[in-house]
C-alpha cells in the first residue's frame, strides 16, 4: 500500500506498508488516502515494495504527488512509473529469497500482538497481587 501522511501543497512524501499472512488484519477497507498496489504475485509485490522506496521512484512520486493543491497520487500516476518486469529472472529470484523473510516478519507481528494482549492482561493482575505465580498452572 502507498499512503500519504500529512503533506501540504507542493509537498508530498509517500509512505509504504506491506501486508499479508493476516497482518495487520484478514480484511481491510481503504479510503482515498491509500493506494492499494497488488500486482497479483506475492514475490513481485515484495519486489515492488522495496523498489518503490528507491530514491529514483521516491523522487518521481514526490514530483507527481506534490503538483496538486491537495498532495497525493492516483492510479494513473502509479501506472506511469517504470518498473521491472515480473518475468525478469532477477525479480523472480529476489521474490524467492525475500518472500519467506517477509512472511515470517508478518507472522511474527501477529504473534507479537497476541503476546502483548496476554502481557497487558496478566501484568496488572500480577502487580496487584490478584494473581500469584505459584497459583498459575503450567502445561508440561
Language-model segments: residues:
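Amphipathic alpha-helical coiled-coil/heptad-repeat segments
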Residues: 42-43, 47, 58-60, 64-68, ...
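A short beta-sheet element
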Residues: 1-53, 64-79
Amino acid at each position: 500500500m502507498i499512503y500519504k501522511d500529512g503533506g501540504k501543497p507542493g509537498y508530498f512524501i509517500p509512505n509504504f506498508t506491506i501486508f499479508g499472512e493476516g497482518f495487520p488484519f484478514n480484511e481491510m477497507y481503504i479510503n482515498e488516502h491509500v493506494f492499494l498496489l497488488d500486482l497479483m504475485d506475492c514475490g513481485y509485490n515484495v519486489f515492488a515494495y522495496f523498489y518503490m522506496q528507491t530514491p529514483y521512484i521516491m523522487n518521481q512520486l514526490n514530483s507527481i504527488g506534490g503538483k496538486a493543491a491537495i498532495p497525493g497520487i492516483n492510479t494513473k500516476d502509479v501506472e506511469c512509473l517504470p518498473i521491472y518486469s515480473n518475468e525478469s529472472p532477477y525479480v523472480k529470484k529476489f521474490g524467492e529469497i525475500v518472500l519467506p523473510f517477509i512472511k515470517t516478519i508478518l507472522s511474527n507481528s501477529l504473534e507479537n500482538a497476541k503476546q502483548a494482549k496476554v502481557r497487558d492482561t496478566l501484568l496488572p493482575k500480577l502487580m496487584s497481587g490478584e494473581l500469584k505465580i505459584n497459583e498459575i498452572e503450567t502445561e508440561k
